[in-house]
Amino acid sequence: MSDAGHVDAVCKPLGAADIRELARSAGVRPRKTFGQHFVVDPGVLRKIARYAELSSEDIALEIGPGFGSLTLVLLPLVRRLLAVEIDRVLAAVLPETIRRRCPAFADRLVVVHGDVLRLTTLPDDPTVLVANLPYNVAVPAVLRVFERFSTVTRTVIMVQREVAERLCADPGSPAYGAPSIKLRWYGRARIVGSVSADVFWPRPQVESAVVRIDRQPPPVPGVDRAAVFAVIDAAFAQRRKMLRRALSGWAGSAQAAEERILAAGLRPTDRGEALTLADFIRLAQAPPTR
C-alpha cells in the first residue's frame, strides 16, 4: 500500500461533499473576514505534507485548520499537531471530526482557539509550520511564527500566488517589498508548487502557490531586529520615494537621513526596492547625527 493509501486507511480524508456537509451541520458559511477557503482535494494536501518532509519526531503547527482537511493528512506523520483556529465554531467542531475520521491518531491533536497574530505561547514547542493560510493574514502570520517560536525550523504554506511571489522576490523585482526582506531575516523562501483555484471551496478569484521557508541563523549576530524592521517599514511606506525623503521621518530630517544613508555606503537617491537585507542592516547600524 502506498503512503497515501496507508494514511487514507487510518484517517479518512475530507472531500468536497464531506466539507459541505460539515459546514451545513455546524451552521457555518465561509467567512471573508477570516479569509476562509477550504481545500477539497486531498491529493493537494498530501503534496503539501511531502514538501514539509515531516518526521515522527516533529511537532507541527497548523494555522487555520478549518474542518480538518490538512489536519487529517498531517496527524499520522508527526508526534503532535498544534492547530490554531480563530473561528470559535470550527475550533469546537474540529476535535470531534478528527475522533470520527482518524481515531488512531486523534490524541496527537491539540486545538488552540485563538488568533495567531496574538499568540505568545503554545502547549508545546513546534518544529514545523504546515498550513493553508487564510489569505488575509498570510504574511503577518508567517512573520509572527518565526518571531515568537524559535524552534520552528521550516514552514510549508499554501498562500495566494501574489503573496508567494512577494515572499520569494529578489531586489528590483516588482513583487519585492517589506515582506520579502523581513522574511530573509529568518530564512530563505522558495515556491515549490502551484495550486489551482478549483481545489477550494468557495473558489477564490486567484491562483495559489506552496512556499517552503527554511530557517537560517540571523544574518548578523547581535543586530537589533526591531531596529532593522523599522528602517524597512519606513523605506516602503512610500515605496517610490528616494531614500533621502522616505527615511526623513525615521532619521528625524531629510539631512539626517542623507548622512546615515551615506554612512551605510548607500546613495540618497536609491530606493528601498533596490536594497538588500544587508543594506538595511547597515542603515540601522549607521550612527545618528549629533
Swiss-Prot record:
Major localisation? cytoplasm
Under PROSITE patterns, the record lists: RRNA_A_DIMETH (PS01131), SAM_RNA_A_N6_MT (PS51689)
Give the InterPro entries listed for this entry.
KsgA/Erm, rRNA_Ade_diMease-like_C, rRNA_Ade_Mease_Trfase_CS, rRNA_Ade_methylase_Trfase_N, rRNA_adenine_dimethylase, SAM-dependent_MTases_sf
Q: Which reaction does it catalyse?
A: adenosine(1518)/adenosine(1519) in 16S rRNA + 4 S-adenosyl-L-methionine = N(6)-dimethyladenosine(1518)/N(6)-dimethyladenosine(1519) in 16S rRNA + 4 S-adenosyl-L-homocysteine + 4 H(+)
Keywords linked to the UniProt accession: Cytoplasm, Methyltransferase, RNA-binding, rRNA processing, S-adenosyl-L-methionine, Transferase
Q: What NCBIfam families does the record tag this protein with?
A: ksgA (TIGR00755)
This protein is called Ribosomal RNA small subunit methyltransferase A
